[in-house]
Amino acid sequence: MSSVVVVGTQWGDEGKGKITDFLSQNAEVVARYQGGNNAGHTIKFDDVTYKLHLIPSGIFFEDKICVLGNGMVIDPKAFVEEVAYLHERNVSTDNLRISNRAHVILPYHLKLDILQEEDKGANKIGTTKKGIGPAYMDKAARVGIRVADLMDKDAFREKLVQNLKEKNRLFEKVYEADPIQVEEILDEYYAYGQKMAPYVTDTSVVLNDAIDEGKRVLFEGAQGVMLDIDQGTYPFVTSSNPIAGGVTIGSGVGPTKINHVVGVSKAYTTRVGDGPFPTELHDEIGNQIREVGREYGTTTGRARRVGWFDSVVVRHARRVSGITDLSLNSIDVLTGIETLKICVAYRYKGEIMKEFPASLKVLAECEPVYEEMPGWQEDITGAKSLDDLPENARHYLERVSQLTEIPLSIFSVGPDRSQTNVVRSVYRP
C-alpha cells in the first residue's frame, strides 16, 4: 500500500498540477478532495498544453481512476464543459468518478459571490467569483444541494424552491438585485446532472477498496496551505482545507491510510489576489520573474504577485500538513539573477520571529530577514539530476531544503513533464 498526498506549500499556483501529473504515471488512482473550479492547473506534455479546473491531472492516463471527492463543490455546467474540452482533444473520461456526496454550485452561488465581493469594496478578498465560498456556506448551513440530489429531479426541485426563497430575499432586500426563478435553473441543471450521472458513485468505497488492494493512490490538493481556511492567512483564504488533513474529510479515507505528504513549492513565491505577502517584490527583478515564469493565473488570467522564497511560510506548511517530501518547481526561472534572496525569518518591532503569525496586523508589520546567495547564469532546463546543476543552483536547493526542514524529493527545471526529476521516490513504503 502506498498513498501519497500532494499539497501546495504557498498560496497556490506552485505547480501542483504538473507534479500530480508526473506522479500519476506511477499511481493507479488520482483523487481531488476539496475546492472546485477555482483551482487551475496547467499540464504540458508532448508540446501540448492542457488547462484544467475541476478534473484531476491523472485523466490523461487511460488506466488511472480519477476521483472528484465528497469534499469538493462542483459546478455542473463547468464540469460538462470541461469534459467536452477533453473529448475535443481525444482524451477519454471513462475513468472518472464523482462522489454522490459532493456539493454542487448553482447560479445563485455565482451571483452571491459577485455581489458579496463587490459589497466589500476595499476589503475584498480577491475571490475567483466561481461560487465556491457561497456553496461551502450552504454546506455548513446544511442547506446545500449534493450530487445525489441532482440525480433526482423531484428532490432537486424541492431543495431548489426552498433555497431560492432565502436567496431571493437576500438578493432583493440586501443587494437590491433581481431574483432568480426556479425555472431558470431546474431543467438546465438537471440535464447537466444527467450528463454527470454515468460518473457518479460512492467514491469513499472506490478509494478505500483501492488502498486495501495495495494500489497506489494519489490525492491532489487544490490551492495551497496558506489559503487553508484554518491554517492560512485568514480571511484571505479559500473556503476549504487544502492541507493534508483535508484528505480524510474530503475523500472518506481515514488518516491511518496516508503514507507520505509531498509539499510542492516554487523556488520563489507567488500569490493571486489580496492579502499580506512579506517577501513581495515591486522592482525589476519581480517583473523579470513574473515574465520569465509566465506568472498569470490559469483561472483568472490575473498577473500574480511575485516575491522571494519564504522559508517561514513553507516551514509553517510543513508543520500543519505533516510534509515528508519537498518538490521544488520553476528553478529555471531564477537563472540569470545575480544575487538570490531567501527569507529565513521575520523582524517584528525589533524582535526576530521564526514562526508564521496568526494576526494579519502583525504580519503586515513584519519585515523579511534575508539570506543572500549567489545566482547562476547557465541554462539548466536540460538537467536530469542534481549533479547536472551548476554548483550555485545545487547550493540553493540544498539551502531551501535545510531551511524548510523538508528533504528534497523532486525538482523541476521547466514546464514539461520531461523536465521533472526525482531525487527519491515518494512511493517508498
Swiss-Prot record:
Main location: cytoplasm
GO biological process assignments: 'de novo' AMP biosynthetic process; IMP metabolic process
Subcellular location: Cytoplasm
Residues annotated as transmembrane: none
Pathway connected to this protein: Purine metabolism; AMP biosynthesis via de novo pathway; AMP from IMP: step 1/2
Top EC class, one word: ligase
Superkingdom classification of source: Bacteria
Co-factor(s): Mg(2+)
Cofactor stoichiometry and binding remark: Binds 1 Mg(2+) ion per subunit.
Reaction catalysis annotation: IMP + L-aspartate + GTP = N(6)-(1,2-dicarboxyethyl)-AMP + GDP + phosphate + 2 H(+)
Residues annotated for substrate binding in this entry: 298-304
Gene3D superfamilies listed in its UniProt record: Adenylosuccinate Synthetase, subunit A, domain 1, Adenylosuccinate Synthetase, subunit A, domain 2, Adenylosuccinate Synthetase, subunit A, domain 3
Residues binding GTP, per UniProt: 12-18, 40-42, 304, 330-332, 412-414
EC code: 6.3.4.4
Molecular function GO labels: adenylosuccinate synthase activity; GTP binding; magnesium ion binding
Active site: 13, 41
Gene Ontology CC terms: cytoplasm
InterPro entries: Adenylosuccin_syn_GTP-bd (IPR018220), Adenylosuccin_syn_Lys_AS (IPR033128), Adenylosuccinate_synth_dom1 (IPR042109), Adenylosuccinate_synth_dom2 (IPR042110), Adenylosuccinate_synth_dom3 (IPR042111), Adenylosuccinate_synthetase (IPR001114), P-loop_NTPase (IPR027417)
Keyword terms: Cytoplasm, GTP-binding, Ligase, Magnesium, Metal-binding, Nucleotide-binding, Purine biosynthesis
Database matches in SMART domains: Adenylsucc_synt
Residues at which Mg(2+) binds: 13, 40
Biological function: Plays an important role in the de novo pathway of purine nucleotide biosynthesis. Catalyzes the first committed step in the biosynthesis of AMP from IMP.
Similarity comment: family membership: Belongs to the adenylosuccinate synthetase family.
Protein name (record): Adenylosuccinate synthetase
Gene that specifies this protein: purA
